[in-house]
Curated annotation (Swiss-Prot):
Alphabetized UniProt keyword annotations: Cytoplasm, DNA damage, DNA recombination, DNA repair, DNA-binding, Endonuclease, Hydrolase, Magnesium, Metal-binding, Nuclease
Catalytic-site annotation from UniProt: 7, 68, 141
Chain's role: The RuvA-RuvB-RuvC complex processes Holliday junction (HJ) DNA during genetic recombination and DNA repair. Endonuclease that resolves HJ intermediates. Cleaves cruciform DNA by making single-stranded nicks across the HJ at symmetrical positions within the homologous arms, yielding a 5'-phosphate and a 3'-hydroxyl group; requires a central core of homology in the junction. The consensus cleavage sequence is 5'-(A/T)TT(C/G)-3'. Cleavage occurs on the 3'-side of the TT dinucleotide at the point of strand exchange.
Organism: Mycobacterium tuberculosis (strain ATCC 25618 / H37Rv)
Cofactor or coenzyme needed: Mg(2+)
Name of protein: Crossover junction endodeoxyribonuclease RuvC
């Protein structure tokens, strides 16, 4: 499975591509950071991110895009910009029929390091080890994008099982409702 990991941001947006093999075997295929000037207009910054992400999607053809879910930070402007960048990325993927999944920072840290409170240095060290990279990915946005892709690769089987179980439960509930309504109608 090819997974594009994205650490969204307006100033720096980390992009990565990982391919999963048997078991927990992973191969890093590409990683980059899209940068936009902080003094540029918001629309221009989002357009630059969109153009870069669309190029990645059209070049690498991932099956899934894993994006970091934005949580409350102290700076509301930063949160809004990050969320807007994430929305542009999700839209670009959706337009191409590529599945999009969001993962929380603590979920990613736990998947990669075993500790949901790990710091950036620990995440970077584990990403380097897991992917057998020759050097640590820099800046942190690149390492975070790789960590997101790793997290999704390792969680994908669980996500698929949960979706299948939910679908079966919904189908059973619909059948039960149909049977109940038929019983009510027959009782009239």
């Amino acid at each position: 499975m090819r997974v594009m990991g994205v650490d969204p941001g307006l100033t720096r947006c980390g992009l990565s591509l990982i391919e999963s093999g048997r078991g927990r075997q992973l191969t890093a295929l590409d990683v980059d950071v899209v940068r936009t000037p902080s003094d540029a207009a918001l629309a221009q910054r989002l357009l630059a991110i969109s153009d870069a992400v669309e190029h990645w999607l059209d070049t690498h053809h991932p099956e899934v895009v894993a994006i970091e879910r934005v949580f409350s930070q102290l700076n509301v402007t930063t949160v809004m910009g990050t969320a807007q960048a994430g929305g542009v990325i999700a839209l670009a993927a959706a337009k191409r029929g590529v599945d999009v999944h969001f993962h929380t920072p603590s979920e990613v840290k736990a998947a990669v390091t075993g500790n949901g409170s790990a710091d950036k240095a620990q995440v970077t060290a584990m990403v380097t080890k897991i992917l057998a990279l020759q050097a640590k990915p820099t800046p942190a946005d690149a390492a975070d994008a790789l960590a997101l892709a790793i997290c999704h690769c390792w969680r994908a089987p669980t996500i698929a099982r949960m979706a299948e179980a939910t679908s079966r439960a919904e189908a059973r509930a619909a059948q039960q409702r149909h049977a109940y309504l038929a019983k009510l109608k027959a009782a009239r």
